[in-house]
Regions:
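S-adenosylmethionine/decaboxylated-SAM
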Residues: 4-29, 36-153
Length: 155
């Protein structure tokens, strides 16, 4: 018998159990579960702050992030929202609505992180250190290096 892994965050566990596979994306449920568990553990230890995802796409992993953050925290989602078509942002918003992620808990940001300075990234994410950043944007070395650089400065 295989036991399903849980994060310990009821809203996240519900989403992972019944909604995750309904949202188009590339991140595995396993990775989302492990990251959700990490976010819960951070909260238990008093580590607070907003979170971000670079490469939000239609929200598969991002919805988990948004459901995991606590009161006064936000999820920031960076994407161009243009691939594979022009309706990606609308699908993200519809997916968030369908899976219980309230719009006042997240901010989709249509920016190319490869062109952002550290200060611009900080301004867009509230100016405070982020407690978690998921990088799943452009996978080419130059772009990934830039995303890692932005993340390292803001964690």
């Amino acid at each position: 018998m295989t036991e399903t892994l849980k994060t310990g965050i009821p809203a996240v566990d519900r989403y992972l159990g019944t909604g995750y596979d309904q949202v188009r994306g590339f991140s595995s449920r396993y990775s989302a579960t492990i990251c959700g568990h990490l976010l819960r553990r951070q909260s238990e230890l008093g580590i607070r702050g907003s979170v971000a995802e670079i490469g939000t796409f239609e929200g598969r992993f991002f919805i988990m992030l948004g459901l995991a953050v606590g009161e006064g925290e936000r999820a920031y989602g960076f994407d161009l929202f243009a691939w594979p078509g022009s309706q990606v942002l609308e699908r993200l918003l519809a997916n968030a609505d369908a899976h219980g992620l309230a719009r006042d808990r997240f901010t989709p940001l249509s920016f190319d992180t490869g062109k952002l300075t550290a200060q611009e990234f900080s301004n867009l994410t509230g100016g405070a250190p982020l407690r978690f950043i998921h990088i799943d944007g452009d996978h080419f070395p130059k772009a990934l290096t830039q995303d890692l650089r932005l993340s390292l400065i803001h964690i």
